[in-house]
Amino acid sequence: MPEGDTVARQCRILDEALAGTVLTTCELRVPREATADLVGWRVAEVRPRGKHLLMRLVPPVAGPPPLTLHSHLMMDGIWHVDGRALRSSDTSSGPRPADTIRVDLTARHEDGRQARAVAYDVKQVRLLRTADEDELVGHLGPDLLDPAWDEDPALRERAAANLAAEPERPIGLAMLDQHVLSGIGNIYRSELCFLRRVHPAAPVAEAGDPAELVDLAHRLLVLNRDREVRVTTGGMLGRDGDLWVYGRGGKQCRRCRSRIQRGELAEPRLEGTESRVLWFCPRCQAGPGCPPSAPTARGRRR
């Protein structure tokens, strides 16, 4: 699943291509919004909120309220801009079948240039009033890539407080909960735990200062939001040296040469959470085990 840095880069590319343009065609290929007519509407901006994409639109005439076209990349979603796919560590940039198109937009710049944006395999496509965006994203915790992060210490403080609120909860589950803080996915979950020398199954109370973890997560997402290939090692380890533990089960730890282990962690007490695979070093991250857990039913928004 694309993580917060990938979504932020996707939004930046869409914003650069579409902000200020007027829609000349618009197809929303989802039943709920299939009859929406947005021709003539102007794209004001495209902004991320955690892992959600918010395309804000201004009506062509006075009267109707501004609207937001919301989408979520989920596991396989991607936007193509003028036929070019986003390249990232999270997504395949190869061709996509036409029957997976969910949004197809063409737009005109003031100078007459045309732009096209096509969304493949995106989920949760919905059109709503911009004033009502919180109906879809209000449940999210502080966004690690919020533009106001450096100027507003309350964002960092709230994220740290959210993490600390359930001291017995495994840190590897708390970090992945978008209600706690938004932007971290499975890759960053594994990498952050390794960098903090914390076992993913360790309780929050034993995982060190939550504020320090939040700071590290913020720095890593900022570092990678403009990169096609995500790097958490500093990029000094050569080929196949971008990550410390994620996806490296059975390979040597880059620090101690122990074998990286693959485990699973689930939270049955929360409806809709599923067992998610993670990776860790048993020596650098000594702690409780991560036994396999059966998936539970879907339900909670991510």
Region roles according to the model:
Residues 1-4, 149, 207-214:
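Generic detection of long, well-ordered alpha-helical segments
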Residues 15, 145, 149, 218-221, ...:
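Short amphipathic alpha-helical signal-transduction/dimerization elements
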Residues 23-37, 47, 158-302:
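Basic, nucleic-acid-binding surfaces and adjacent catalytic neighborhoods in DNA/RNA-processing proteins
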Residues 63-183, 188-197, 207:
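Phosphate/anion-contacting hairpin/loop surfaces
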